[in-house]
Amino acid sequence: MAKRTLFGTDGVRGTANREPMTADTALRIGMAAGHLLRNGDHRHTVVIGKDTRLSGYMLEPALAAGFISVGMDVVLLGPLPTPAVAMLTRSLRADLGVMITASHNPFQDNGIKLFGPDGYKLSDDQEATIEALLDNGLEGHRAGPTALGKARRLDDCNGRYVEFVKSTFPRGRRLEGLRIVVDCAHGAAYRVAPKVLWELGATIVPIGVTPDGTNINKDCGSLHSRVMCETVVREGADLGVALDGDADRVVLCDEKGALVDGDQLLALIGRNWKRAGTLQGGGVVATVMSNLGLERFLKDEGLALARTPVGDRYVVEHMRAEGYNLGGEQSGHIVMSDFGTTGDGLMAALQVLSALVAEDRPASEVLDVFTPLPQLLRNVRVAGHDPRAILADPQVARAVSAGEGRLNGGGRLLIRKSGTEPLIRVMAEGEDEALVAQVVGDICAVIETASQ
């Protein structure tokens, strides 16, 4: 497999109007991806969705121009969640799906995620092939004047996704009597998420639903959940739901304002699906970041926890290869392959709401599935330095080895570079919270010194 340099763990990402997030590079990515995925004799189609970032107005037409120039028709969806783009790629029998988003990042960033005709994210090999096409020139792949593609907008895409998500909620159940705070992060779900919950009968308190192009994820959404938690308590709500900018991840909070992460959601859904006889694969797929408490809980339930590298695409790849139908990340990506091909925050929230309705107990009881071990994650910014070189630094290596020795088999230590930002992430967990904090602090200090 050729080495990827443009694509990270979740597509291409960077600062808007700076390489690689320029109109020129977006056009060339469209040409290369269109050439790669343009298979068969039928009329070729690509669907393009986006979140609410200002730079989407620049990248959307650039990508469309690239696809049109290699003979592909373009269907423009406008602001719509990432899982909706994956769903519509399959529904419209498109050759390719594109989501313009930088997910949970601030508005200054943007990115490009690519989906194949089956609705799954492209493989590492396919992304490497696209990079090779970019490097080797695209002149020979342009369509002739009469073979250019066309572009049109799909007017009812929001309604299609709303009905699709609602179809995953058990028939006969309604959300009447539940008061739900939904934080859409001023992002891609600002129209569809409140609509789904309202149509299922809930009383909704929407926040983060007034995007202006620059406020996506700003002090709101799944990474900044304080406002949601405070609003739940103030409004006397039964549950809070916070999505990120492209709505492929979710975190919740109970009626007391306590935050509930993806590990608890995996535990709840996995246990319930096991009892219902619908869980496949004998367990759940998660990443190396998931809490050891989740692993112990699943073991007590007679279920396995399969771990993958960080990134929902790797979770999905393992699920497909080994026959699992539930996986996700602590950050709130929850993948349920019975319903979809990628993480879907809104769909995951409905699984939890279904449990609330069925059990008729407060969220604080239903969502307290297991007790997590003390876990601490810190990010060290290393802009301008190669994270791999820093991690290979002898002083850093000694600090990591010393940390592992101090945990002495009673916990886990994980140090890795981010696939989407110039960060090194340091995570430790164990029974002794004070020791965990010391280990993380010492390693971060050495990394900061090495990156100066």
Curated annotation (Swiss-Prot):
Cited InterPro entries: A-D-PHexomutase_a/b/a-I, A-D-PHexomutase_a/b/a-I/II/III, A-D-PHexomutase_a/b/a-II, A-D-PHexomutase_a/b/a-III, A-D-PHexomutase_C, A-D-PHexomutase_C_sf, A-D-PHexomutase_CS, Alpha-D-phosphohexomutase_SF
Gene3D superfamilies membership: Alpha-D-Glucose-1,6-Bisphosphate, subunit A, domain 3 (3.40.120.10), Alpha-D-phosphohexomutase, C-terminal domain (3.30.310.50)
Names of required cofactors: Mg(2+)
Top-level lineage group: Bacteria
SUPFAM superfamilies assigned: Phosphoglucomutase, C-terminal domain (SSF55957), Phosphoglucomutase, first 3 domains (SSF53738)
Keywords from the named record: Isomerase, Magnesium, Metal-binding, Phosphoprotein
Catalysed reaction equations from the record: alpha-D-glucosamine 1-phosphate = D-glucosamine 6-phosphate
Disulfide bridge map: none
GO biological process annotation, one example: carbohydrate metabolic process
GO molecular function: magnesium ion binding; phosphoglucosamine mutase activity; phosphomannomutase activity
Keyword Cell membrane in annotation: no
Residue(s) carrying Phosphoserine: S103
Function: Catalyzes the conversion of glucosamine-6-phosphate to glucosamine-1-phosphate.
HAMAP family: GlmM_B
Name under which the protein is recorded: Phosphoglucosamine mutase
Organism: Rhodospirillum rubrum (strain ATCC 11170 / ATH 1.1.1 / DSM 467 / LMG 4362 / NCIMB 8255 / S1)
Taxonomic placement: Bacteria, Pseudomonadati, Pseudomonadota, Alphaproteobacteria, Rhodospirillales
